[in-house]
């Protein structure tokens, strides 16, 4: 949207180069505005700019909603360090991620119900072309934790406000920032009960400790 590009240009972080500005502009312009604007190529590029490695994108519909299926590459294992500690969007990411595009303002309850009724069985992402306030997100989290906490796949919601915030981040910081801003409002358990292998990302930030283990 033009207003978002104008905001970005007026609030460009100090030290940004022309390349940073162009990257942010492209990220903003790939955002879907209205059902007719959704196309697979734009969604694929949007998620590549967000920090995923998307091989291809297929557009579809579920009920009355526009969806896209991303075929993605998971993060490599045994790296020296990771950008974030969330394995389902890293080394344990599935080969396909569903993206749902919703348009128009709705209450927190309506938003959750509209997403849940689509019957998606694995973690997915909602792009909401509307604005969520802090109160909206808290209401959304409360409804998820108390009413939709059994048998429902986790999903992350990116609204226009968050999308603009992400545009103002450098490209390698967008995915970690998105997870930090969305995971508190959904159900996700990064830990496993009992014994078992630990995802590489769980050593996030512990570079020296991880190096010492590998050198043993």
Task: Give the ranges of each region predicted by the language model.
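Short, flexible loop segments at the rims of nucleotide/cofactor-binding pockets, characterized by
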Residues: 101-103, 201-202
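Conserved adenine-nucleotide phosphate-binding loops and their immediately adjacent elements
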Residues: 172-205, 209
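Phosphate-binding P-loop
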Residues: 211-215
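Residues immediately flanking
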Residues: 102-105, 130
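Extended, compositionally biased accessory segments flanking or bridging domains
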Residues: 1-92
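A short, acidic, amphipathic alpha-helical segment used as a generic capping/interface helix at domain edges
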Residues: 105-116
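Charged, structured surface patches that assemble and position nucleic-acid processing machinery
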Residues: 59-75, 85-86, 94-98, 120-182
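A general structural signal for short secondary-structure junctions and capping/turn motifs
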Residues: 90-91, 115-118
């Amino acid at each position: 949207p033009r207003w978002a590009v104008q905001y970005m240009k007026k609030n460009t972080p100090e030290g940004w180069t022309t390349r940073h500005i162009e990257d942010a502009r492209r990220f903003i312009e790939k955002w879907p505005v209205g059902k007719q604007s959704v196309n697979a190529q734009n969604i694929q590029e949007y998620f590549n700019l967000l920090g995923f490695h998307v091989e291809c994108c297929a557009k579809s519909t579920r009920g009355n909603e526009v969806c896209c299926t991303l075929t993605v590459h998971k993060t490599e294992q045994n790296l020296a360090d990771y950008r974030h500690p969330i394995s389902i969007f890293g080394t344990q990411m599935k080969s396909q991620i569903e993206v749902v595009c919703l348009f128009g303002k709705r209450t927190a309850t309506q938003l959750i119900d509209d997403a849940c009724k689509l019957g998606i069985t694995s973690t997915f992402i909602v792009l909401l072309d509307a604005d969520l306030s802090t109160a909206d997100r808290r209401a959304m989290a409360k409804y998820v934790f108390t009413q939709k906490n059994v048998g429902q796949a986790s999903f992350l919601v990116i609204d226009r406000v968050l999308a603009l915030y992400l545009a103002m981040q450098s490209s390698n910081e967008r995915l970690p920032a998105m997870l930090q801003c969305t995971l508190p409002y959904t159900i996700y358990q990064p830990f496993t009960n009992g014994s078992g292998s630990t995802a590489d990302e769980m050593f996030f930030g512990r570079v020296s400790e991880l190096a010492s283990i590998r050198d043993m």
